[in-house]
Regions:
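Glycine-/small-residue-enriched capping loops at alpha/beta junctions
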Residues: 26, 69-71, 88
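Short, charge-patterned binding micro-sites
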Residues: 50-69
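N-terminal, positively charged regions that mediate nucleic acid binding
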Residues: 1-49, 54
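Conserved acidic
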Residues: 23, 27, 73, 153
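Glycine-rich, mobile lid/loop segments that gate access to catalytic sites or pores
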Residues: 15-19, 57, 79-194
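Short, conserved charged micro-motifs
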Residues: 69-77, 145
Length: 194
């Protein structure tokens, strides 16, 4: 998230935050992506609109519309979510036990209205009402400058700080006390001279 504000005295304050993979927002996105990837890997013609809702204390709600020749039982979806959460480093000691967290699975078949709008017989004619938009910076060796020069400084600092802390959490003793849910925020004040 990037926020910009002025104080009216010639200063501009730019703020950016970055969250770790264990933060509820990214955990929910990761579980949804895993459901989509699992279906598409086994059935490339699958239609999957998977959503996940969770908080830092639970429960987890997995819902959406799925039409796929590959069947996953409700317990199978729960296992995907539990394994994903466990892989992020969540444990009973951190208060988010992957084996005990309540998970509610509410997937239905894709709406026939949407199916009629995207298929004609076996021929696909559209993508339905779902889409993904992604924005990111990429590294190009031929650029005459560092790609971080293209990103807002508060975002670069928030991202790099959290990457470093998360790496320490995964590889050192600090991981025994530092939970996977982390957020960093930087606020940079600029004056008229920059």
């Amino acid at each position: 998230m990037d926020i910009q504000a002025t104080t009216g005295k010639g200063f501009l304050h730019k703020s950016a935050e970055f969250v770790s993979p264990g933060h509820p927002d990214r955990t929910a996105d990761g579980i949804s992506a895993l459901v989509v990837e699992t279906h598409v890997r086994h059935n490339p013609a699958a239609h999957v609109a998977a959503e996940t809702l969770l908080t830092s204390k639970g429960p987890i709600i997995m819902a959406g519309e799925i039409t796929s020749a590959y069947h996953i039982s409700p317990d199978g979806y729960k296992a995907l979510a539990r394994d994903y959460i466990r892989g992020l480093g969540w444990t009973k000691d951190f208060g988010y036990d992957p084996d005990k967290i309540e998970i509610l699975v509410l997937y239905n078949s894709q709406s026939t209205d949407i199916a009629q709008g995207v298929e004609k017989g076996r021929k696909k004619i559209g993508a339905g009402d779902q889409g993904i938009t992604t924005g990111y910076a990429i590294r190009k060796h031929w650029l005459p400058f560092n790609e971080d020069d293209l990103m807002p400084l508060p975002l670069v600092l928030a991202r790099n700080t959290l990457f470093g802390i998360d790496q320490l959490r995964r590889t050192s003793k600090i991981g025994k006390v530092l939970k996977p849910d982390m957020k960093s925020e930087f606020i940079i004040s600029y004056n008229s001279r920059g």
